[in-house]
Amino acid sequence: MAQHTVYFPDAFLTQMREAMPSTLSFDDFLAACQRPLRRSIRVNTLKTSVADFLRLTAPYGWTLTPIPWCEEGFWIERDDEDALPLGSTAEHLSGLFYIQEASSMLPVAALFADGNAPQRVMDVAAAPGSKTTQIAARMNNEGAILANEFSASRVKVLHANISRCGISNVALTHFDGRVFGAALPEMFDAILLDAPCSGEGVVRKDPDALKNWSPESNQEIAATQRELIDSAFHALRSGGTLVYSTCTLNREENESVCLWLKETYPDAVEFLPLGDLFPGANKALTEEGFLHVFPQIYDCEGFFVARLRKTQAIPALPTPKYKVGNFPFSPVKDREAAQIRQAAASVGLNWDGNLRLWQRDKEVWLFPVGIEALIGKVRFSRLGIKLAETHNKGYRWQHEAVIALASPDNENAFELTPQEAEEWYRGRDVYPQAAPVADDVLVTFQHQPIGLAKRIGSRLKNSYPRELVRDGKLFTSNA
């Protein structure tokens, strides 16, 4: 693999020499940083099994190497990378996999280690969504996830990735993560804080990542991280699990933040060692039981992961003085809910008791039951999935609901050819050789739901959302 030139400030190199364990070679560290990052993907088990995904992609000649800490994760090598971007493959467009850096799969592996099965989880800094979607897959779309993102521009990307992966158990918020300890005390079984950091571990992806690096900046970031972990710890229930992670390498933003929390709440913080998380984890193990992953150890990004347990309650923070405002939704009454469920089933949309129907004006939504305890305590940017809009003739089913809820075995399912599927993703109407019988058609490709179409004569009217329409080269290689 070709080398690329990474910018290293002298003070950073000095700091890394001091931080690196004697068992590791500093020259190996420098050499690893100069190598471009290996591409990696995670199979979305909400949509397909790993075995079925491997069978589906076998004809492509992709080389898929298992990632030791994530059984759904693979490093990927492709001969056709220049001809077709990974994000334009049919399997990516239909949500069968997520392009995710291997080391960023570690925090969720730690969160669910040792049989941990949380029912209400918070992802404090969630965009662009790799870890939220990984958590949802581990929970099998059950329970509830609060996915928060402070950056307004990234909330939209977060929602798009959640929708593409067919996730229904997520509520989105847009706050500074420091508010949750006061706003939602002891409300979560598990919390992931993948903290904003100095990004020292990402130089293999971005050779200029350290252009603005300074020791002073590390200290400022660490101060924010301490406030974030303190807030998250307050929001965690007694007995719950907190995973703290960064994509940086200095101790100030990593071990020191966790040690500060333990010094602050000595009787409530227990470090849970990660040496048995996967075979070979001990190569990155610190004396505290954290994983401090230098890039040469597993040939991935630099990363840090710590797992903590809250052993007892801690004094509550002052109750916030802000007003949440009126919640604009109301539960759907039983009789109407039965009608909606029957109408939805007729086009192949079904859901279980983890979701409940709510309405706002002419909109019908499905919210995860596990999030209802938070209503009135925090303002949501988006909650659950929008199922339908009502109109004179019935319901206008929404694309995100089709992707999350549709069964490809429904009698109205209509399988497209590769060329027809590509036309669909380009936002064009489809003219199949043999038109389906039903008026509302569940459009599938590779036996995966990709949308809902209206049959008008021999034409399938495209309903693919305009903001998702793709240009350029797609999977049939026709631009």
Swiss-Prot record:
The active site is at residue 247. It is an enzyme of class 2 (transferase). GO terms for cellular component: cytoplasm. It catalyses: cytidine(1407) in 16S rRNA + S-adenosyl-L-methionine = 5-methylcytidine(1407) in 16S rRNA + S-adenosyl-L-homocysteine + H(+). GO terms for biological process: rRNA base methylation. S-adenosyl-L-methionine binds at residues 125-131, 149, 176, 194. Its main location: cytoplasm. GO terms for molecular function: RNA binding; rRNA (cytosine-C5-)-methyltransferase activity. InterPro entries: Methyltr_RsmF_N, MeTrfase_RsmB-F_NOP2_cat, MeTrfase_RsmB-F_NOP2_dom, Nol1_Nop2_Fmu_2, Nop2p, RCMT, rRNA_ssu_MeTfrase_F, RsmB/NOL1/NOP2-like_CS. Keywords: Cytoplasm, Methyltransferase, RNA-binding, rRNA processing, S-adenosyl-L-methionine, Transferase. Specifically methylates the cytosine at position 1407 (m5C1407) of 16S rRNA. HAMAP family: 16SrRNA_methyltr_F. This is Ribosomal RNA small subunit methyltransferase F. It comes from Escherichia coli O157:H7.
